[in-house]
Amino acid sequence: MKIVLATNNKDKVKEIKAFYDGYEIYALNEICEPFEIDETGSSFKENALIKATAVYAKLCALKLENEFIALSDDSGISVEALGFAPGIYSARYSGKDATDASNRKKLTCELHKLRLKKSGAFYTACIAVASKFGNFSTHGFMYGTVIDEERGDNGFGYDFMFMPDGFDGTIGQLDVKTKLAISHRSKGLELAKYILNSLEKYYK
């Protein structure tokens, strides 16, 4: 059984490959021409399933459904002081042409509008799997505090502003091994292993 990820995000691909080192994993652009997927869902789960099923439909069109499954991740940060924004809009928080840097800048500005330097926050990740045997999903969470400054140089997204509970530094200041052990995505991927292990025997 081979896995195609519903993303071309190099950081996500690298992180998922590191976690699932026993599986044969491909980025979307390694299997087919990249295509836009409209994330029209109202939750992380809905968006993750939209992405996974769209990629699986492409696999079926290429007659690869007996060889591959599709796996997607939809994740984001929810900040208590901001009414749990940006949530599902984390990747495009600062607008249509958002970048990680512009999103972090907007988050800092929103905190400062409230005269805050920090707030309770949590990350959510939904992992969705689409296969010829159906669609499945899991969730992972990481709780902590978001701060109004960036620290560290390891990670992406909002990692440099997020201090997980039990740690004195941000995710951006942690080594890769520690991040993989505690992250929301890793927790969701760990639960998804049960799905992958169950499916794998039918693809041999």
UniProtKB/Swiss-Prot annotation:
By its UniProt entry, which Pfam families does this protein fall under? Ham1p_like
GO BP: any one term: nucleotide metabolic process
Single GO MF descriptor: XTP diphosphatase activity
CDD domains according to UniProt: HAM1 (cd00515)
Q: Which cofactor does it need?
A: Mg(2+)
Positions of the catalytic residues: D74 (proton acceptor)
Keyword set includes tRNA-binding: no
Q: Which InterPro entries does this one have?
A: dITP/XTP_pyrophosphatase, ITPase-like_fam, RdgB/HAM1
Q: Which UniProt keywords apply?
A: Hydrolase, Magnesium, Metal-binding, Nucleotide metabolism, Nucleotide-binding
Q: Which reaction does it catalyse?
A: XTP + H2O = XMP + diphosphate + H(+); dITP + H2O = dIMP + diphosphate + H(+); ITP + H2O = IMP + diphosphate + H(+)
Q: Which SUPFAM superfamilies match?
A: ITPase-like (SSF52972)
- Where along this sequence does the record place binding of substrate? T7, N8, N9, K10, D11, K12, S75, F156, G157, Y158, D159, K179, H184, R185
Q: What is its EC number?
A: 3.6.1.66
Gene Ontology cellular component? cytosol
Keyword Amino-acid biosynthesis set for record: no
What does the record say about how the cofactor binds?
Answer: Binds 1 Mg(2+) ion per subunit.
Give the family per the record: Belongs to the HAM1 NTPase family.
Assembly description: Homodimer.
**What this chain does, per the record?**
Pyrophosphatase that catalyzes the hydrolysis of nucleoside triphosphates to their monophosphate derivatives, with a high preference for the non-canonical purine nucleotides XTP (xanthosine triphosphate), dITP (deoxyinosine triphosphate) and ITP. Seems to function as a house-cleaning enzyme that removes non-canonical purine nucleotides from the nucleotide pool, thus preventing their incorporation into DNA/RNA and avoiding chromosomal lesions.
What's the protein here called? Answer: dITP/XTP pyrophosphatase
Source organism per UniProt: Campylobacter fetus subsp. fetus (strain 82-40)
